[in-house]
Each structure stands twice: as C-alpha cells, then as structure tokens.
Amino acid sequence: MTHAPTPPAASNFLRPIIEDDLQANRFQGKLWAGKPGPAALQAQGQPDPARIRTRFPPEPNGYLHIGHAKSICVNFGLARDYGGVCHLRFDDTNPEKEEQEYVDAIIEAVHWLGFDWQADGNDNLYFASDYFEFMYEFAEALVQAGHAYVDEQSAEEIRASRGTLTEPGTDSPWRDRPADESLLRLREMRDGKHPDGSLVLRARIDMASPNINLRDPVMYRVRHATHHRTGNAWCIYPMYSWAHPVEDALEGITHSICTLEFEDQRPFYDWILARLAELGKLARPLPHQYEFARLNLTYVVTSKRKLLQLVREGYVDGWDDPRMPTLFGLRRRGYTPSSIRLFCDRTAVSKSDSRIDYSLLEQAVRDDLDPVAPRSVAVLDPLKLVITNYPEGRSETCSAPRNPHDPQAGVREFPFTRELWIEQDDFREEPPKKYFRLFPGNTVRLKYGYVVRCTGFTKDESGKVVEVQAEYLPDTKSGTPGADSVKVKGNITWVSAAHAVPAQVHLYDRLFADAHPDGGDKDFLACLNPNSKQTVQAWLEPGIEAVPGATWQFERLGYFTVDSKDSRPEAPVLNRIVTLRDSWQAA
C-alpha cells in the first residue's frame, strides 16, 4: 500500500498567545491552595506549580462525540506542552437534563482518549455543583454592591424588553429597586418560596449596550428540580454564562478555551470577573477566555437532539453503534485513541469556521494502524476454488509476514489444501479488459502459495457460479527456488476451506450519503446512507484469536476489529473500521 504523505502540523493560534503570556510572566505570583476557592483561600496557598491551567468542561447531558475530542485534545494538549494542568470539570448546572450515567461515560471516554487530570497531588476532577455555595455568596455580594437585582417580569416580558440588534432594550420596572429588597427576594428564591419562572436574578449592566448579551443578562432562575449530585438542596440554579467565569476563577484557570459561539459572551465573562475581583471575592490574575472554531465534519451530525433521534427511532443500534460519531461508537468501530488524537492534531485550531472532510479522519486511522496492525486474510464473499491436481487430504504450510513494516513481528503460517475459498470478485466467466484475476484459461498466483491455471467452473440451477476449478504448478510455491519462473499479472487472496474460521462481519460505511446532512432546511434523516451497514458471513485465516478489540489489516480489504459487544469465541463478530483506500469523492 502506498502511504499518503504525512500532513504538516496544523496551525494553532493559541500557542503564540500562551508563549507570550509565559514570556511576560503574566501569571507570576499566582497562588494555588491545592483546591479551588475564592481569593481568601488562594491567598493562603503556595506559588502555583502549574505554569498554565486549562479545562475541559462538558455538561453531563449526553455522550461525547468527535467534536468534543477536538476540545479535549486542545485543552489537555496545551496544558501538557506548556507545563500546565488541565482540569476535567462537569458543568452540571441544568438538573433536568443531567445524569450520573453521563458523568461516568465522560470520565471513561476522556481516559480512553489517553488523558488524565491528576497532577501535583490533586485530582483536578471538579463539578460546578461543588461551587454552588460560592456562586450564591457572590450573587449576594453583587446585589449588595448594586451590580445585580431581582426581576419579577415573566420570561416573555424580559425577552420583549431586550430590544434588537438595531434597537436598545428597555429597563425593567424592577431594575432600580433597593438593594435590600432585591437581597430579600433573592433569599426567598433560595429558600424555595417562589415557583419556577416567577423571579430571576439579573446583572445590572447596560440595557442600551450594542452587545445584547450585556443587556442585564439573567444570572439565576428558580428551578424546583432534583440535582443528580446535590439532590433537593437547591431550588435556584445559575445560568451557564454566570457560572462559567466563576468556575474558571475559582479553579485558577489561566486560559479558558471555548468554541466560537461563546465569543459574544466574553464581555459578560470579563464583567463578572472584574466586579467580583473588585469586591475581593476572586484572586488575580483573572482567567481570560479565548474562542476557536468547533470541529465540523462532512457526512456527520453532532447535534445531541439529532443523535438522540437516531437512537430513539432505531436508525442506529444505540449510542455506541459503530456508525455513530460518539467516542464510544468510534471505539467500537475500531478507531484507536491515538488515531483520534492524530486526526485532531492534523486539524487547525483557528477562528474560522470550516468543515473537515471525513476522509481525513479515515486516513488518520489508516496511518495509525498500518505500522502496527498484523496482516491476515479474510474472504467476505466466498467462492469455492478446487485445485483438481492437488492430492485430496494433503495439507502444507504457507507463510507470510505478520507486518511488512515490522520484521520483528515475524511470520504467520497457514495451511494450503485442495479446496480453498476465494472472493467472488476474483473470478469472471467473461472478463472485462485489463482483468488479471481468474477466468477460464488464465493463470494467477494464489498469494503466498502457488500459481494456478483456471480450467473450469460450475454453476447452480440459477446460473450462478458456485465453484471454480484450477490446476496448480508444483514448482511455483512462494518463497521457494523457481517460484517466479512463471510470470503472472494477477494475485488473489485465499483461505483453506477445511481450516478457515467462520465469522460474521459488519461492513460499516458512512452513516450519511450527503456530505452536509444538517445543512440548510434538509431533513437529515432523508440523507441517511442505506448502505451504511452490510452484514456478511465470511471465512477468516485460521490462527486468528477473536479477542474483543483485536485489530487486523485483512489484505486487499481494509482494517477490521473484533466487536466488543456481540463477538463470542465460538462465533466471532468483526467490524470493518475502514477500507484500505478512500472510495468516496471529496465533498
């Protein structure tokens, strides 16, 4: 197989920023008390051993997908490369949608991807819910300082009063209520004395700001809901735009790296941090938010709503279906953690939205597996080949490299017998031009075995060819003197019919046939690829140990792995990871 040239390292606009920060000693004097906390706690700490701190902050309301992998690699990778620490933080501020199941799955997925958050004796696994008391304390401080107020308008009234991109908003009638009155209402909200949606806490900023996100954004809302960690201890929950900067500051994050949709929220992020630092609640230096373009792939949807619809309506077989873009789906498909990291490293970290061709992900797993995957042979669409002049009952050993790139891997041995399985596509009764495989009268090499000449074939009642006959040339066995005395143009793979291992093989392909299934007004379900999964009964080279997760390159076919859920020692099930070459047109 011809190797594609290794792509150059992708650009990352964040690296020069971090290098400038470190060169300017912007974090010199930053203290760390060994755990997150407000300014008073951090003042008791020691100089932070981490040169930078980043974080990966998923909400535990679903399974991680390939887009999350990019953010994971960016945040953990930058921390690793610059002597820092990356925190894993769960932004669990929305109790109706979050579950412990997702927490456990996210932890497993990040670990599987090859990253750890333990450093300097700290676990660095955190939850936004750990900071609810701090957030509430800070909210009271903002109210008392005149920076926030409790609004009793309905959600519809608040929405209508925000204005538009071209028109300013209008002040709430509650905007100028006395701080003591707002504080009383906030405490009533905290104590559960008001129903859902009746009151909110809003920041007092500027209702005429050209940035709508600064028009007195909501900070707290009433939600009488059970939280997966705190139970019923709270009935008010922070909005993400309020919680996010507070969490970052409490954890001593230096570089808060988000996707582009949070760019318009950055002024509020900075406003919150500045006000709380002025009030002595947060330690300086304060975090800074940076935004990069999210990873968008062709032939993929990553919307949680759409992925959930695929699962619930039975278009796929669960969240770990090998066609899904979830990390568990990719893992079951046979993608390795290193292949996903390689793919992420090859895609730029930039501020420009773009769509990456799915073939780059497939090429990453090819490049990752090619040097290490043992070779073997499988016949997916079997046709019987009988060597008529080979003695019945006889068997001899053929050999081949386990991996041509790794001489230390040694050789594999497999039997040659009178009856073999070959691919249906390797025989033609009437061959087209430039067809060099088996057809009546033609000579080919059985790879690693003998040269054979086709002498005939047999059809069933429907006219389908069910058996091919051939004669072998005894002095042409691969690896023996004179093996190349007969020149042939075709090589075909085979397995011994008497020794081959039967297996079920799932031939997976892209889930969508349309490169942009979620573009415009498309019905994404109408873009599904009807051939994204085909199941065949195959014959495998003997000697294969069908251990879940084991991976091979089946010669001429692609890379395959043993399914982690359905495979059994007595009944192997394999998944095709990727073909040897890309068969799709570039999007």
Curated annotation (Swiss-Prot):
State where ATP binds. E59, P60, N61, H65, I66, G67, H68, A69, K70, S71, T259, R294, L295
Annotated Gene Ontology cellular components are: cytosol
Q: Does the keyword Ligase apply?
A: yes
What the entry lists under SUPFAM superfamilies is as follows: Nucleotidylyl transferase (SSF52374), Ribosomal protein L25-like (SSF50715)
Q: Where in the cell is it found?
A: Cytoplasm
- Per the record, what are the reactions this protein catalyses? tRNA(Gln) + L-glutamine + ATP = L-glutaminyl-tRNA(Gln) + AMP + diphosphate
The similarity comment for this entry is:
Belongs to the class-I aminoacyl-tRNA synthetase family.
Protein name, as recorded: Glutamine--tRNA ligase
Name the encoding gene, please.
Answer: glnS
